[in-house]
Amino acid sequence: DLFDDEELLKDFELNSTGFWSFIKGDDKYSRQKLSGDLERLRSYYLDRGYINFSIESTQVSVTPDRRSVFITVNVAEGEQYTVNEVSLAGDLVVGEEQLEPLLIVKKGQVFSQQLVTYTNDLLKRRLGNEGYTFAEVNGRDHNANDEDNTVDVTFYVEPGRKVYVRRINFSGNAKTDDEVLRRELRQFEQAPANTSLVDLSRQRLQRLGYFSVVEADTPRVPNSEDLVDVEYKVEEQPSGSIGANVGFSDASGFIFGANVTQNNWRGSGNRVSFALSRS
């Protein structure tokens, strides 16, 4: 075996009975948990170059008293493969010279499905910055050479239609005026949808400090192939503070003070402070 059992089992949700199992409950058999664990096992090998890894069989047996379950997983590990050639294919609406620097899968590396997935995401985000919000990128390994254990990887690009923003909407801002939110936006209506600008706008809304949660979505406009709306959903949180203090002086005796600060006065986005003192 290439990897010892302890290494392979450390990410399993199912676990053998141990000291902490009573508290964590991770020693209770579940078919769903086992299915997830087998998928994690498959990913473990694919991320380390074993492209022909397979699970040959899984046996689950129960003891006569039905108090314990034994699980045996038989696998075929295969050989480790390295990357030979990396290429782009499909409709490259964004120039190849701009996409190639995003290919983190490199010739000579041990093949990793995780790096392929990361590269898919980077390419989709780059296309999304040019208005191709619903682009699909699928990195595939092919042309496996069993003599030198190498494999080619090609990223197939399907950009889809370029889309534009019809309208930007807000929900959940019961106290805060839309205009306060709108001035933080870097994605604009009628402009091409830009994944990075939509996310930058979400970050700017979050940094206002008025909201505990800010979520962004870009649903398609019904009956349109090239229009989306941008939906920002927020959850408001308290944006003010109250303070009090007590002091003493020979001339005035005890001095009592209080201050109130509101960072989003009446939903306008303005900061207002009040201070009172009495002796």
Language model: regions and residue ranges:
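Periplasmic polypeptide-binding modules associated with outer-membrane biogenesis and secretion
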Residues: D1-D250, N259, S273-R278
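Short loop/turn motifs that connect adjacent beta-strands in outer-membrane beta-barrel proteins
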Residues: W265-R271
